A protein has these predicted regions:
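Segments of small-molecule ligand-sensing domains
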Residues: 304-314, 325-382
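N-terminal export signals
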Residues: 5-26
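Signal peptide-proximal N-terminal region
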Residues: 58-80, 198-201
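Extracellular/periplasmic periplasmic-binding protein-like sensory domains
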Residues: 244-317, 382
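Extracytoplasmic "Venus flytrap"
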Residues: 32-33, 37-59, 83-89, 112-113, ...
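Periplasmic-binding protein-like
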Residues: 99, 104-112, 132-134, 176-179, ...
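Beta-alpha junction/loop-to-helix N-cap segments that form part of ligand/metal-binding clefts
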Residues: 30-32, 51-58, 73-140, 209-216, ...
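Extracellular/periplasmic Venus flytrap/periplasmic-binding protein
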Residues: 90-94, 139-140, 147-251, 286-296
């Protein structure tokens, strides 16, 4: 046999032996089979913000159960691949990198945290992995250069400006700000000072709270020294609980206002009566009031999986999953990532039943600017 003939046969055999692996890789890269479509999520299931991650999981499970019970999307069942990152940005990046390298997910949904999302957005863009509903409202992560990221919730800037405007409109100008000592908190501080500056006001005191709350006493002392009329909380997770308790003890009647992520449902439960009177911004309807079809659907889905405690976090995750399912349905049976992006861009005031999502405008793609205000009662639920 000639050398040329030998090499020709050898190369063909090698190609044939590799073909099944290549076919598997091409298929796995999209996280799609004839029967399933797999969605990835990295979130804090443990650590100081573990309550938020648990809510994301429960809300997604409720929506997926409801959708799959009706036949799924285009004949496929939705599967969620959720991995704990403990709210550590490097772990988030490692988790998402593994999903991309393994080719195990078709799209990404609701990864949590400002610094965590900052760590993964470059690889999301580089890999062309569609990413729906980051669980953060940071404006720094919403820029015109992104083409694969579709936000659902309103921004922290939207929330902060609404809160500051409300306080100033009530004649309360001596505002103090406590912010978490990380990227999330520092951005909220910038939003708050910018919103106040518009009205010619600046904080009478500001202090950075460690994510584990270890400097709580110093923070409270610094804030109270400024003699504020109200305190704006740019904090999240268990650190918020200790802060609210300490501020309430220092000045029981002083108004405290926070954002949608200041407290998880578990945090609200742990606060109990100490949380009564706390004002919070809301970027989704009240999860405990079945006034809109989407909230009624959510509550039914939660009950179907044996959950009868409703929360803003699980409602947000439920809505995010419903948005993704609608996009998957619009993308058609012959599913590709490009078709999913095109489907999302077709959302023009899409009404989920009292909550609209719109991606018809230019990037950054932000589906909602809904912001409302609520006040907690002693039972941890919004009053009225």
């Amino acid at each position: 046999m000639s050398r040329r003939r030998f090499l020709s046969i050898g190369s063909k055999l090698a190609a044939l032996s590799l073909a099944p692996a290549l076919i598997r890789t091409a298929s796995a890269q999209e996280g799609v089979s004839s029967k399933t479509v797999t969605i990835g999520c990295s979130s804090a299931m443990s650590g100081p913000l573990g309550g938020f991650g648990s809510a994301i999981k429960v809300g997604a499970d409720a929506a997926i159960g409801q959708i799959n019970a009706k036949g799924g999307v285009q004949g496929r069942q939705i599967e969620l691949q959720m991995v704990d990152d403990g709210y550590v940005p490097q772990r988030t990046a490692d988790n998402v990198r593994k999903m991309i390298d393994d080719g195990s997910v078709f799209a990404l949904m609701s990864c949590m945290g400002t610094a965590n999302n900052a760590a993964i957005l470059p690889m999301v863009e580089a890999s062309s992995l569609p990413y729906l509903a980051p669980f953060t409202g940071a404006s720094s992560l919403r820029n015109t250069g992104t083409r694969n990221v579709f936000h659902v919730r309103a921004s922290y800037t939207d929330e902060t400006h609404r809160l500051v405007q409300k306080l100033l409109g009530m004649g309360i100008k001596d505002l103090a700000v406590v912010y978490l000592d990380n990227a999330f908190g520092k951005e909220l501080l910038a939003d708050a000072t910018a919103a106040m500056a518009v009205k010619g006001v600046q904080p009478v005191a500001q202090a950075a709270l460690a994510t584990d709350g270890k400097n709580l006493s110093e923070v409270v002392a610094k804030i109270m020294a400024g003699k504020p009329a109200a305190v704006l909380l740019g904090t999240a997770g268990t650190a918020s609980v200790g802060l609210i308790e300490a501020l309430k003890k220092a000045s029981p009647m002083m108004p405290l206002v926070g954002q949608s992520v200041t407290l998880s449902a578990l945090d609200q439960k742990n606060l109990g009566a100490m949380g009564s009177g706390l004002a919070l911004s809301m970027v989704f309807p009240d999860a405990n009031r079945a006034k809109t079809p989407v909230v009624r659907d959510y509550q039914a889905a939660m009950r179907a999986i044996g959950k009868d405690e409703f929360s803003q976090g699980s409602l947000e995750s439920y809505i995010n999953t419903r948005v993704l399912a609608e996009a998957l349905e619009r993308a058609g049976r012959d599913l590709t990532r490009t078709k999913l992006r095109t489907a999302l861009l077709s959302f023009d005031k899409f009404d989920l039943g009292g909550f609209n999502v719109d991606y018809s405008k230019a990037a950054p793609f932000v589906g909602s600017h809904y912001v409302d205000l609520g006040v907690l009662g002693a039972n941890g639920r919004f009053i009225g």
